[in-house]
Amino acid sequence: MTSSRIVRVSLAALIAAGLSNVLGAQSTFAGIALPSVAAERESAGARNVARPTIVLVHGAFADGTGWQHVIPILERDGYTVIAVQNALASLAGDVETTKRVIDAQQGPVVAVGHSYGGAVITGAAAGNANVKALVYIAAFAPEANEPVGAYNEKYPSALGSALKPDAAGFLYIDRAKFRDLFARDVSVTEASVMAAAQKPVIGTAFAASVRQAAWKTIPSWYVVAQEDRAINPELERFYAKRMGAKTTEIKSSHVPFISHPAEIARLIEQAASAAVK
């Protein structure tokens, strides 16, 4: 056999062996076992499945940009995050918008709702097997067919007197009272921007209800804002106890995700970790 023939045979054998190893469980280099491409893909797939997508749902008088302090923390820690933008023109419409976002995700989801957004995730996540955890932040958590504002008279807050309806029935917070009632532990500058950019909510949303309550079947976490003047903290404790939620209390105004973003991110990540065990 000529030397060129020997070289060609040797190369063919090496290529065949290399392909066999790549397609198999592992390959070797200098006697050291290396993971195959297939094994790497399996490992990457397992990591992706194990880390839920975080869907953040804003409340009334706000929009998805309110999560701007929490999102970078979650993303830094490897989570995919989506902040829903709801119209606040009807509870049913906001539930449907949020449901579409949740349904579009691949793999497990953690749904997080602030304030009125708690009612939204309660309806939107119901019946979705991919939603593994719910996180309520100073939020409404109604029963099925229970109006969002069912307990506002039993557990009154100072916010009611500061609400100003427009001709179409949408509610705004009096800007002169916004920081004191909604964000008193946020800087004056940031609270001023929040007041100027507040997104009004249709008043009838608080008389509306959801058809199913997701927290009945999905593990839930609840953050009570101890210094909340928009939703009575006692109402928050009532909701948390009723749903059997894992409860954390933070010395905060109505917006702890703005004034205490690291704590809120940590809680969301705890829920996410527990959800995939």
Language-model-detected regions and their locations in the chain:
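Conserved loop-alpha-helix segment in the C-terminal half of the alpha/beta-hydrolase fold
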Residues: 226-252, 258, 263, 271
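Conserved HGGG/HGGXW glycine-rich cap/lid loop of the alpha/beta-hydrolase fold
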Residues: 49-91, 127-130
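Gly/Ala-rich beta-loop-alpha elbow adjacent to hydrolase catalytic centers
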Residues: 112-117, 121
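Bacterial N-terminal signal peptides that target proteins for export
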Residues: 1-13, 17-24
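Active-site nucleophile elbow and catalytic-triad environment of alpha/beta-hydrolase enzymes
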Residues: 193-214, 226
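Flexible "cap/lid" loop of the alpha/beta hydrolase fold
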Residues: 130-131, 135-175, 202-206, 239
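Conserved strand-to-loop "acid loop" that flanks and positions the catalytic carboxylate
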Residues: 134, 219-228
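Signal peptide processing junction and immediate N-terminal pro/mature segment
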Residues: 22-42
